[in-house]
Amino acid sequence: MIPAVLAQDPSIEILVVDDGSPDGTGAIVDAIAAINPKVHVIHRAEKLGLGTAYIAGFRWALERKYDLVFEMDADFSHNPERLPEFLAAIREADVVLGSRYQDGHVNVVNWPMSRLFLSYGANIYARFVTGLPVFDATGGFKCFRRNVLESIDLNSVKSNGYAFQIEMSFRAWKRGFRLFEIPIIFVDRTEGVSKMSKKIVREAIWMVWRLRWWGMTGRV
């Protein structure tokens, strides 16, 4: 994954946030980082949740004054060859989102129908409740301008599951930043355990209503 990402643009650098992965990911990335100054890693002792991992990565990038900050899965679910399209799109936007459901089309591979219906329905639900003008609010392939992340009080971000993606896009949108979607094909890994759980689903169900209320009361 790392060589494929670095090959897309000479200015790209990589940060891997490792939550104590049992498969040795942290040690592998450490070895790569030791010989490649464009590769970096944050080690966390245990799994603290998707949202806090992204926040840690955002803070790291902001401290080092990167102009653009990407987030993406590290298992080829997100195709690194699409990165140049994100870089082109961000010239006219503030946040670029990779959309699995652009204009109502479904571009997902290796998901059972139950998971697909849950995800697709969740995005319709989130759009209806919050008014967020995107087809795919829960996707994790994004590019942010630095000033977007700087404008958001990262300490106040409450979501830690997939609702985190909705919350970050909603906060950016409510601040007047331009969101732009580009279609992607999401290929789910065929090995490993899904991070989806009842707790994550419950968080997403209620968080969109909190976001709606915060938006109405100017608290985002």
Feature names for model-found ranges:
Residues 18-27, 76:
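A conserved acidic beta->alpha catalytic loop
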Residues 132-133, 156-160, 169-185:
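Catalytic donor-sugar/metal-binding loop of nucleotide-sugar-dependent glycosyltransferases
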Residues 206-220:
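C-terminal, non-catalytic tails of nucleotide-sugar-dependent glycosyltransferases
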Residues 38-40, 44-63, 68, 80-162, ...:
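Acceptor/aglycone-binding surface of glycosyltransferases and processive sugar-polymer synthases
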Residues 1-7:
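Short, well-formed alpha-helical segments that are part of the catalytic scaffolds
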Residues 13, 167:
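Cell-envelope/extracellular polymer assembly enzymes that use nucleotide-activated donors
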Residues 32-36:
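Short, conserved SAM-binding/catalytic segment
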